[in-house]
Amino acid sequence: MKPNEKNTWQLAQPVLLNLFREEEERWRHDPTTVLPAFKRELLDAGFEFELLHQSLNYLPACIDVVLPIAVKYFCLSTSINEKQYIRNWFSFRGCTLAVPPLLHEIEENMDKPSWCWELGDTLLRIRDESHAEEYLAIVKDKRYGIGRQNLVLLLGRIKYAPALPILIELLNDQEAALQAMTAISCFKSPDHIRYLEPFLSSHDPDYRKQAEKAIARIRKAAK
């Protein structure tokens, strides 16, 4: 299989190629890494590339073939750094096979809010509506801290109505209030403007700006 030519410029620069070669050379000295096996399985599946990162050029066109392989090695890896890298292969709309392991990873890493934030970002890109209850359960749990932010946005993006009472509550949560404003505006209901208006006079410019944007979005949809 040939890669998507329009994406190959990203890896054509010699400096970038050398960096990726050096990285793959380091794999030889790490017996715990799953990345060589991941690369081998993609090559065995018929993809043509020199460096693992170049296989991203096949996406999203060949996602049906790549997704099960990528999810397999995401689950096998014991390294957060590796998992951060592997999730690049399924950060696309519709990669629903990746959702359960991503959610499991969040639940196992409650004490790592930045990592949970990144996992939530991947879930936001995938946008699978069938796990809305699980997203909401995480969003409701303040122990995840900022790790909830992208799932708050996701609940708005998929317009999950049962989440609305929680989203309104989150307007008083400093770790998720800005995202809650955006999520509430996704429902485009004029009835929700009253929850956002108090923030127009906030001392925090970020709150004022986000409230203005959210209200404007609702009013535009109502016209």
Label the predicted regions:
Residues 1-15:
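Terminal targeting and flexible regions in eukaryotic proteins, enriched
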Residues 31, 35, 66-67, 99, ...:
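Core helices of alpha-solenoid repeat scaffolds
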Residues 11-29, 40-62, 72-76, 81-95, ...:
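Structural detector for internal amphipathic alpha-helices that build alpha-solenoid repeat scaffolds
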Residues 1, 222-223:
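Short intrinsically disordered terminal tails
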